[in-house]
Design a protein with these regions (language model features):
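Secretory/export targeting leaders with adjacent low-complexity proregions
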Residues: 149-180
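Single conserved hydrophobic/aromatic residue that forms the stacking wall/gate
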Residues: 1-10, 253-258
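Bacterial N-terminal signal peptides that target proteins for export
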Residues: 11-21
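Compact, glycine/acidic-enriched structural inserts
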Residues: 126-161
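A contiguous strand-loop segment
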Residues: 36-130, 159, 163
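Short acidic-glycine loop/turn motifs at beta-strand connectors
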Residues: 44-47, 107-109, 182-185, 191-196
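Bacterial N-terminal signal peptides
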Residues: 20-30
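C-terminus-biased signal that marks the final domain/tail of proteins
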Residues: 35-51, 59, 65, 75-78, ...
Length: 258
């Protein structure tokens, strides 16, 4: 198993980490190496424990570095004059990809954000004159400004900016989707499809992988739930199979915790 990197964010004072540790171990080793084979999952445990984990199975070293940002940092969405500006409300610790943008992080309120690859992502909308938000700082914008998933969904659903998506340093297209989770266990998935932002929100949004889009992942997962994970689970490293396995383990251990 080729695990390039992982992030585990624990937001709870509970001393009972046995189930969380078991879940994390299963999660990390169920994901064979792939070119863009990342998986994000949220464990909802006893005593309001919330654990968000993701793998970073990228085809090369993403040159990750950790940064600690305080409150009160002034930022711009892009170098363009037509951009949004803000001052960070919350401090955060983040992982940068290629040292040019925030891929993952958690702010001081327990909001976690994770960017994963999604081939179907399309940010372009014809004749779009909205202010620009660079894809490299989109995740940081969320961590800087919102304490909960509800807050983030309420603001991002207004679609007041457009996403600029330059190619990655290795020449790959920066087609990404974003997941967030908060200290209450709520989650949301954000995908830009044909220039429009599609949002899925709820505690049940515990898993995100890669292609296909989230709505199609749910349809495929429904099929496997009819079979039953204790009977058979799909075993390849395809994103849809990883989604099914992670969903099964999330449900299994969340049910045990309850």
């Amino acid at each position: 198993y080729g695990l390039v990197g992982s992030e585990m964010c624990i937001r709870d004072r509970s001393k009972n980490l046995t189930l969380a540790s078991l879940f994390a171990g299963l999660f990390m080793f169920m994901n064979p190496m792939g070119s863009e084979a990342c998986t994000r999952a949220v464990y909802l445990g006893p005593d309001d424990m919330v654990v968000t984990g993701r793998t970073m199975d990228w085809k090369e070293d993403p040159q990750s570095n950790l940064y600690l940002f305080p409150r009160g940092v002034q930022r711009r969405g892009a170098i363009s004059d037509n951009t949004i500006q803000w001052t960070s409300k919350y401090g955060s610790v983040v992982t940068a990809g290629y040292d040019i943008g925030t891929c993952d992080g958690m702010n001081e309120k327990g909001l976690v954000a994770n960017l994963l690859f999604l081939t179907e992502s399309s940010y372009f909308r014809p004749d779009d004159n909205r202010p620009v938000m660079g894809l490299s700082i989109w995740t940081q914008y969320v961590l800087d400004n919102f304490a909960t998933v509800d807050e983030a969904v309420a603001e991002l659903s207004k679609e007041v900016f457009r996403i600029d998506d330059p190619d990655l340093p290795n020449g790959a297209k920066s087609t990404l989707h974003l997941s967030i989770s908060d200290a209450s266990g709520n989650s949301a998935i954000f995908e830009y499809l044909n220039g429009n932002l599609v949002i899925h929100e709820g505690r049940e949004c515990q898993v995100m992988t890669n292609s296909p889009t989230y709505d199609k992942q749910l349809t495929l997962n429904d099929y496997w739930q009819q079979i039953g994970g204790l009977v058979m689970l799909p075993g390849t490293n395809r994103a849809s199979d990883r989604f099914v396995r992670a969903s099964f383990y999330c449900l299994l251990y969340t049910s045990d915790a309850a």
